[in-house]
């Protein structure tokens, strides 16, 4: 006889996309027929056969502290901003629940690739002394979930399914 899973609920959501910095603006832009696709002009994209992509603008990260911007990968930063939106939306339903009864489950394809790329360049161009000592904590796949749990004070665990 199968064990019945514990009930769970999604009570908030967030998004940071090329179309908008929150779910409402993203949905409105989508409904208005806007496209988040643009020309790629970054140095790293010059050798790519594809010259377009959907990029979240750097301005989307401005609300994060400079310290957090230096000590976390863009992947974790975007996850944190979206999680803050979801947390705000869910707050009326989660008030009074002990933090140890709330968990973060945040999936990622691979984690901090921009950190891996940047630090590889530091290593090859400047040697081992130029590599950021926070490289590993910044690039591991579970960094976004951990950052969200720390930021929101969630104590029930931080889990990262990785494809």
Question: Positions of the model-derived regions?
Answer:
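Conserved "HGTGT" condensation-loop signature of ketosynthase/thiolase-family condensing enzymes
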Residues: 1-157
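Short loop-beta-helix segment that forms the pyridoxal 5′-phosphate
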Residues: 157-163
